[in-house]
């Protein structure tokens, strides 16, 4: 091979490396996205894609502002190997996870109070604030009959 061939090969390798770095997701950090939906009195959380969750914790934001170590209203830890999960509901059981403190139940959420959800999946961590709304079904049951 002559000098011109080596230069063309080097240019192709450099252009290939530039393409891979700028137009692929190989070197971009993974970002976990969380959304919530509070229909019918139940809060459902959706993750951007399925993750093997290692920890879930829900804490009141007002308590978190006054106390760095606020007690969670709901906390789950992975005991060994959780199932890849994309959707879960507040207080529901998730396969492969159990309460951080044995025999504890999730506390009921107070409507209008802001809570923060912390989710961990290995080295990935994310948080999401949400405010539960009043359950319209409960309001309809509470109305007096005319």
Q: For each of these PLM feature ranges, what is it?
A:
Residues 9, 16, 64, 80, ...:
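Alpha-helical interaction segments
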Residues 4-22:
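Hydrophobic membrane-insertion alpha-helices, especially the h-region
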Residues 104-111, 137-139:
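Short beta-strand segments and strand-loop junctions that repeat across beta-rich extracellular domains
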Residues 19-70, 129-146:
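N-terminal non-catalytic regions of secreted/periplasmic and cell-surface proteins
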Residues 107-109, 114-132:
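Short, exposed beta-strand-loop hairpins at the edges of beta-sheets
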Residues 65-104:
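Extended, solvent-exposed segments with strong compositional bias
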């Amino acid at each position: 091979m002559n000098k011109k061939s080596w230069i063309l090969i080097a240019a192709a390798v450099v252009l290939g490396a530039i393409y891979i770095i700028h137009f692929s997701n190989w070197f971009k950090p993974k970002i976990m996205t969380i959304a919530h939906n509070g229909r019918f009195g139940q809060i459902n959380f959706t993750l951007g894609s399925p993750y093997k969750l290692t920890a879930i914790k829900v804490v009141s934001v007002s308590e978190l502002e006054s106390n760095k170590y606020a007690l969670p209203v709901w906390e789950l830890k992975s005991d060994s190997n959780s199932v890849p999960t994309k959707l879960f509901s507040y207080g529901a059981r998730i396969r492969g996870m159990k309460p951080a403190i044995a025999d504890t139940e999730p506390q009921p959420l107070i409507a209008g109070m802001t809570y923060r959800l912390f989710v961990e999946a290995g080295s990935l961590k994310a948080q999401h604030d949400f405010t539960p709304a009043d359950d319209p079904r409960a309001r309809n049951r509470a109305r007096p009959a005319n």
